[in-house]
Amino acid sequence: AEEILTRTLEKASDIIDGVTCGAGMPYKLSEIAARFGIFYYPIVSSARAFNALWKRSYRKTSDYLGGVVYEDPWLAGGHNGLSNSEDPLTPQPPYPRVRELRSLMNEFNLEHVPIIMAGGVWNLSEWEDWIDNKEIGKIAFQFGTRPLLTEESPIPEAWKKRLLTIKKGEVSLHKFSPTGFYSSAVKNEFLKELHERSERQTPFLKEQTNEFNEKIEIGPRKRAFYVKHSDKSKIVEWIRKGFSKPMTTPNDTLIWVTLKKASQIVKDQIDCMGCLSQCLFSNWSQDE
């Protein structure tokens, strides 16, 4: 991502006003943007995240900080920046989190820098108490889903209609993304399959212990894995139902699928085109 941004700005910085970046902790964003005299807009999900970015990097190039995008972990679609201490099933209201972010920014003399609220924004009338609010300070709002429903939007009409009929409980905040981050998406058959597949999952060790004391042999080479006694009966039942192929995950677990599904997964891993800097699904990493 850093190389792509650098090369893009080398060729087109005269027509680019600013760049935004999230999906992790983009420490190098400010350095690259400032080198070309371009504003940068980091995406964060908490005051804690911005504090780390500021102290490590952004304080050196504060003149080019155009704004801070607050992407709410529970309201925004796509990938979300939940920390290990936050419960994905217990949403927190955005106001106190943005107020905390503004308070921190004020400590760094960033009162003039706007916060851009992203996630759950549909109509400005729902956010009137945020506007001209001293606790929030300069604020702007990012519309993500609503523009998808316009006539100019190229997405299929069926998808536009689906977005207009989503009911409470039909959006899933899950951790199936190959990035390793939580992601929010409308529930569909694919997500249903992933949830069911996740339930057919057992931890394992390659060496026997008092807890992992049940041996199972996998594949033509009879590779030995050890699972908990409490999981052995589940595995026997899954195999009986046709989920006879175990596949290892980056989390040292076995997921049990059908032979057909296993073949499809392996093919998809082989066909990986490297769209991420690091992918937990295909084991691809740009640094390896």
Predicted regions and their residues:
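Generic beta-sheet signal
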Residues: 43, 118, 143-144
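Conserved active-site-proximal phosphate/metal-binding subdomains
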Residues: 75-92, 104-112, 124-288
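A short glycine-centered flexible hinge/capping loop motif at secondary-structure junctions
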Residues: 116-123
